[in-house]
């Protein structure tokens, strides 16, 4: 019998060829660098912006983004970020929450119901990367759908 190669379309080169636009909300430059390095080491073209406050987040929402990654911020909570996204022209922009220190797995459903796309742990690099690719694929699909409707 012949063998069948099964390939996950999330890992295709098409996602890597287009620029990935990340808005990273974190008060730590090291985490920002980790995320960028993880993607660039997998041959992604990355345009990322790091910020940690409400005012800059509001300004940046006027620009096109693929995914928001939320860690910790000076004066911004993830709930505020979700509300601002819903009220922007990018209502379907996925927000990934970096696993909070006090996070319990029993809270997962509550975060998802509030509008968080997923909760990922940057310390688990492979899982983080695959979760980010899922969010990126959804974002690109929704962007294409929106362009067709306009």
Describe these PLM feature segments.
Residues 32, 52-92, 99-108:
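Conserved phosphotransfer microenvironments
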Residues 124-142:
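Receiver (REC) domain switch/output surface
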Residues 1-40, 140-150:
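Non-catalytic signal-transmission and effector/linker regions of two-component phosphorelay proteins
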Residues 44-53:
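Short hydrophobic/Thr-rich beta-strand motif most characteristic of the beta2 strand and flanking loop
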Residues 120-121:
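Residues at the ends of beta-strands that form strand-to-helix hinge/output surfaces
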